[in-house]
Amino acid sequence: QVNPGTPRGGGNVKGEDIKKISENKNIYSYVKRINSVADLIDHDIVETKETLANQSPERSKNFKRTVMLTGVNESSKENKFVSGAYKLIEGKHLENQDKNKVLMHKDLAKKNNLKVGDKIKVKSNLFDADNEKGADETVEVEIKGLFDGHNSGGVSAAQELYENTLITDVHSAAKVYGNTEDTAVYQDATFFVKGDKNLDSVIKDLGKLDINWREYNLIKSSSNYPALQQS
């Protein structure tokens, strides 16, 4: 494998490559996703009996207020919202032009007495393996909406709980790692192909772009759009 991914085994797709594909005439829309880690400032995460039982003293110290960020340019097209695992119950979805906005789980909001329109601060976590630059950034974000949804299986760490995931705009998720939207490392991207186009010929066409295709796979999805993932 020529693309080993991030230190934590996450995706490693370049923003500039996503841009090249998105500019193809047969693509009408796309979703790009960044996974990052940050700490809530002055707010607490959701814990369960399971997550507390599994916690080492070191983990409870280093990741006491740590949440997962899913940075996405259009949240209504994000996998978990499409599949129904997450459901927006209040406010509005994140859109392409949004900056410093988040969707928060209703249980996390309830625990911290937060509502749509409130602002919170998140900051880089220096113990996170994927924070390769040792970034120490603080980002203030506004809650644009609340979502619901619960893990189907058990979890060992609080960060795996849906309750402790913030859906953010791409800019905010990139910034906690000291990146911009252009320099960020993306988990994956999904491209929506115009309905009258033959998918195989579009994929063949994209293969001619100036992109190192040894690093990626274009996955053909049954719902008629290719997804870009690390190979």
Listing of model-derived features with the role each one plays in the protein:
Residues 2-223:
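Basic-flanked hydrophobic alpha-helices used for secretion and membrane insertion
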Residues 1, 225-231:
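Hydrophobic alpha-helical transmembrane segments of multi-pass inner-membrane transport and secretion
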